Amino acid sequence: GRDLGDVFSGLDRNKTVGDVVLEVKNLSSPFLKDASFQVRAGEVVGFSGLVGAGRTEVVRAIIGADPRTGGKVFLNGKPLNCRTPHDAIVNGVVMVPEDRKLQGIIPRMSVGRNISIGSLDQITNRLGFVNTRREEQIGLEGKANFNIKTPDLEKPIVELSGGNQQKAIVARWMSTKPEVLILDEPTKGIDVGAKSEFYNMICEFAKEGLAVILISS
């Protein structure tokens, strides 16, 4: 119910945004038809609508979670053809899903592992062994950078509040140094104080030059 101008008061509206990072042309899937838009560096593009309006379906088709039936996607001017969400991650397009419990956190893992798992490709050697020192470092950086309230990284993530669980998911994907960050209902089910933190966080991402897609009902 808040005015978006108040929510994103931290954004400098006089600042010129950068080049087009993500471009979608006539994208179609079994769940949508002919979606087209651009997202520039330092820009927050919002998708709003009722459930079933296609706001989540658009990004699912972009990241390879749903099959495409038509259209094209470009990342920095080059074709982006993601068959799976992993393809999107490798190319610098990451998504924080709407359903935190089913699609976001990994309940049986610790806070630290939930953060570092997004960077598993970078911290695993050719023999499949994980660099545990680097893994811990990523967890500590995520905890500090996103103000995750937990006594230690070994604590099960399910014991954290909803807001801190969500911060851990954001930390996971931001540790991969993405170019495009997709946030699907990022403040759903978290308290008012945490919501304010998230809005400020999104403003900071944009100021740093990240291309952001924000989905909200």
Regions found by a protein language model. Name each.
Residues 1-217:
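Glycine-rich phosphate-binding loops of nucleotide-dependent enzymes
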